[in-house]
Each structure stands twice: as structure tokens, then as C-alpha cells.
């Protein structure tokens, strides 16, 4: 019987080097990359989401990136469906790469996601209340779900509230797990906060220099200031600058602070999973070490 190609997960905090490791590993293993980032799925959000470049995507096939419009409501269930279909149809090693823990769990653990259609009117009413209020509200009606959602994640927060008010039951109580049968290896890239900080600073300044302000300005002009994605990390701060509330320097520093806080929450999330094999992102011969682990874990010689 032919061996089933494994699903190789590369996760970790923002700015830890996941994308570069994935690109190098994919070329070595003749693999493809599936994105696991809740914002990189959207077209036109390129710089602020650190989306793989067109050159990278030409070097290695990437999927689940640029698959919907900024105004679309893309649910976790839809992400899971598309990812599972790709995994079933691609007959080669696959790297699932990103920092959105819920996306990764949806695939690795086979989360059973409630089949509740979007409630447009309810969602609009909730959105008008503002994310801080909605996030606090979620902590009251479904603290389990709230503990798994980032404070700035407008889409996931609204979805959890939407399910609660549509069904009368917390989304967490409607969820279960149905793990896939194919082999899975999870790789985590870790860095101590003092090592990650310079990377965050460098990347933030690089984003601004690459045209983040123009990107946000274009989104506002095209979709208006109330676009939910403009409330997310990197975009919210630049929007404040464009509205004259803060200077560009203040916006940049604010992004750095918020990114550092986001990375701390990501670290806490991923460290809870004992199945992840952790590597120091700065270690010498990182690619060789990861390649060796992957091959041993799924039976050496598979590739």
C-alpha cells in the first residue's frame, strides 16, 4: 500500500520566520504550502499581513491565500472545508503554515464546526457596538470560546456571538473533534521575547517603508472606514494616522507594541499543544534539523 503523504504543520508567533522555513522546506521536500492565516486569505491585504510575495508563490505553490474579497464573510467552517478538500486532492507533501491557531486546530483536530449560516442583520448590530464591547459580551455568554479568540479578532468574535444568539447555545458547546487519519507532524518555531522584539521592530518599519500607509488608504477609499479588517493589527493604527489622530511615528510604535502583545498570546496558545515539536528559530542548521525530524516522524525515506 502506498504511503500517505504527511501534513506538516509549521506554526509559531508572528515574525518567527515561519514563511521562510516553509519555503525552504517545501523546496527540499517537493511540497506545497497551505496558508493558515485568517487575514492572508483576503485579497488586497498584502503588506500588513506579511503575505508571501508573488515570487515566493511562483517558487512554491501556495493555496488558501488571496481567496476572497475584503468585504466577504469567510467563516472557519469554509476555511476548513476548502483546506480539507485540498489535502484530499493534492498527492504530495503539504505544509500547513501560519499563526492562526484556530485554523490549524480546525484541520489537525478536525473540529466539528456548527452549521449556522451568517446572520447579516445581527452581525451588523453587533459590529456597531464595537469590538471591545462584543469581546466582553462573549466572555459572559461563552467564556470558553472567548478564551480561544484574540481580543482584536473581530470576525471570530462576531461569529461566536452570532452562533449563540441564533441557536441559544454557546459555539463551544456545539463543537467537537474528528481527527483526520493521515499522518501529521507539527513544527513550532520559538523565540524568547527579547529575541523576537528586534524582528518585530524591523518588520514593522519594513512594512511602513514598503507602502503600508498607501495600502490602508486604498482600502479606505475602496471599502470605507468601517471595513472590519481595518480594525485589525497594523491596519487600525495606520487608519488612526490617516484620520489625523496620531502621527506616523506613533502609529508605527503602536503596531510594534500591539504585535508584541499578539505574539505573547500566540505563544501561550501554541505552547498548550504537547504534540508540537519546538525549534529555536535562531538555531544553526534549522532547515536540516526540521527535515530530519519530519522524515523520522513519518518514517524515514518517505520523501
Swiss-Prot record:
Xref: InterPro entries: Dimethylallyltransferase, IPT, P-loop_NTPase
Annotated site, Interaction with substrate tRNA, chain positions: 100
Entry binding sites for substrate: 14-19
Coiled-coil residues: none
Highest taxon in the source lineage: Bacteria
Example GO BP: tRNA modification
Ligand binding (ATP): 12-19
GO terms assigned for molecular function: ATP binding; tRNA dimethylallyltransferase activity
Cofactor(s) needed for function: Mg(2+)
Region of interest (Interaction with substrate tRNA), residue spans: 37-40
Catalytic activity: adenosine(37) in tRNA + dimethylallyl diphosphate = N(6)-dimethylallyladenosine(37) in tRNA + diphosphate
Disulfide bonds: none
EC top class named in words: transferase
Record's keyword terms, sorted: ATP-binding, Magnesium, Nucleotide-binding, Transferase, tRNA processing
UniProt EC number: 2.5.1.75
Reported function: Catalyzes the transfer of a dimethylallyl group onto the adenine at position 37 in tRNAs that read codons beginning with uridine, leading to the formation of N6-(dimethylallyl)adenosine (i(6)A).
UniProt subunit comment: Monomer.
Protein family (similarity comment): Belongs to the IPP transferase family.
Name of the protein: tRNA dimethylallyltransferase
Gene: miaA
